[in-house]
Every structure is written in C-alpha cells, then in structure tokens.
Amino acid sequence: MQICKKSSTFAGEMEHLSKAQIKWVRSLQQKKNRDAEGVFVAEGAKCVNDLGGSFELVLQANADNASVNEIEQMSSLRTPQGVIGVFKQRKEDLHSINEELIVALDGVQDPGNLGTIIRTCDWFGIHHIVCSRETADCYNPKVVQATMGALSRVHLYYVEDLSVILNQYKSKGYPIYGTLLEGTNMYNKASIPTKKKGIIVMGNEGKGLTAEVRKEVSHPLLIPSYPAGVATSESLNVGIATAIVLAEFRRNDTINTL
C-alpha cells in the first residue's frame, strides 16, 4: 500500500514523518516490497541530490522531519548519512537504445559488484546495461549506494532470456564480446574492431558466462595475466574486469580518432 506521496510536505516546512511512513521506508529494504511499490531508497545528500534529476522523489527524510533515531531506523547503513530519499523506479525501454557500446551482465549476483560496474560504466560513457534476471537488483540499497548517483545516468534493463536479446542484436550487426579464458588477448590490435557499437558481456562471479550466452559471443576476449606462463590468481573480480575491458575499448576509440 502506497502511503507516501509527494505533497507540500516536501516543500518549505516539512511535517514530521509518521510511524507508518518510517515503517514503510524500512520495509523497502526487501525487494518484494520495492517491486510492489515501484520505488527504491537512496541515502546521503549527494546521492539523493544526484538521483533527483532523473527519478521522481516520493519521500525525503532528514533532520527537518525525522529524529536521529528515526533516521537510523530507516537506514540500511551502519553509519546513516542523515538524508534518505525514496524515489519511483524508472520504466526502461530496451528498444530506445541507439547504436552504441552496451554492457550486458550474465548473472552478476553481488550487489557491491553491480554497483561498481554501474559506476564504472558511468565513468566510461556507457549509458545502457542489459541484465539477465539472475543479476542482482539495481535498486538494492547496497547497489544504489555503491553507484554514488550513477543510476541517474546509466539505464538498466532486465530481460527474461539474455541469450535471445544478444542474438537479436547480433543479427543487427552488433559484435558480441565476452571475457573467456579461451579468448584472444584483448591487447592484440585486431582483437577489438573499430565499430562504435557492440555489446560487452560480463559473467557470474563464480561460473562466468552461461552456455547459452557463450554461444552468442562472436568476439571472445582474454584479459591476460602477467607475466605470461606464471601462476597467478585464478580470476579477476568482475567489477575490476569490467573496468579493464572498458578502459581498453575507450583507449582504442581514442587511438582510432587520432
């Protein structure tokens, strides 16, 4: 039941939050409640302000309308930041994507990793992330906080079958890149074509890409360890791997425009 609506409460003098509103905000830490209400929670003045330009604010809690104890009750953080905002979730349209570089996530489950990836995409000018249903919820409080406001500029789309979507884009001429141990060293000049459009697929933290998604990869890439032939860590954190791949793609963009 929606009990918090935008009103004069959020302009000028703010009315003190009711117990029902405080309980409602606290309930939004659970995905089923966020989905039922179509909202999510952000914390911290900067994050709330950044998101305010792209998402509709439903409720705001701060020192003007809630006590320190009440802020702590609503917060999901160990150290509450004094400002909490509840925003409406955005309805995204996958068909609105133009020909550009896209990131796809195949079952990235850790909220911290997803938040890092969203923030990294924002840094490298990636505006769209297509996610499998098994990927963590982008409106999870941990994800929202990790993005540091990047959700206002990066759009996420959750799809029933990622392999089907990849196949559709491949038929439109999009190269599909995937990080695989049997891939081509991505630092080889020919590994990354000069096309501006494409989809970079990153896999699950423990299992990598699913078999179905792997079949759609047209350009398997390897992030090589150093030095070659010497035992190193088994794999990279998916957030770090995403940053390395995007940095190389953007470096190639720069070289190709010189």
Where are these regions (language model features)?
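Active-site/ligand-binding-proximal alpha/beta "capping" segment
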Residues: 178-233
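Short pre-catalytic strand/loop immediately N-terminal to key active-site residues, enriched for Gly-Thr
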Residues: 38, 105-109, 227-234
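Boundary-proximal intrinsically disordered activation/regulatory segments immediately upstream
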Residues: 2-61, 135-136
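Structured adenosyl-cofactor binding patch, chiefly the S-adenosyl-L-methionine
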Residues: 123, 138, 145-150, 211-258
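RNA substrate-binding interface of SAM-dependent RNA methyltransferases
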Residues: 3, 96-183
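Amphipathic alpha-helical repeat scaffolds
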Residues: 44, 110-117, 140, 233-241
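Short beta->alpha connector loops at strand-helix junctions that form conserved
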Residues: 66, 106, 132-133, 155, ...
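Glycine/small-residue-rich loop that forms an oxyanion/phosphate-binding "nest" at active or ligand-binding sites
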Residues: 66-88
